[in-house]
Amino acid sequence: MTEQKITRAISIRQPYVEMILRGIKKVEYRSQVTHIRERVYLYASLKPGNEKYYAELGVEPGSLPTGLILGTVEIVDCTGFPGEYEWHLANPLRLATPIKPERQPQPTFFKPFNV
């Protein structure tokens, strides 16, 4: 079996990306359904998430990297109802070296590299 090439990235705020990479956060809540069932890059958006989760991770607000692709995760399922969907995540992998995307990030999925 050949390894599937990753072509998509999902934009998520910190500290939620860090929570996914640590295996703490296994569901991403979105207003849109997704039919994607594959490994995607995790892009840490520039806009921060809720500060209370930084404390739960034991890190200072603003101390986690943003504007970079920090890892990958598999989207394995999507459940819910219109306006409130749960994207089920599995098998997060942290990149040894974060990557700056070549293309401008979008709110949900985007193709980060010119291929």
Which residues does each predicted region cover?
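Structured alpha/beta reader/binder surfaces that contact nucleic acids or chromatin modification marks
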Residues: T2-V115
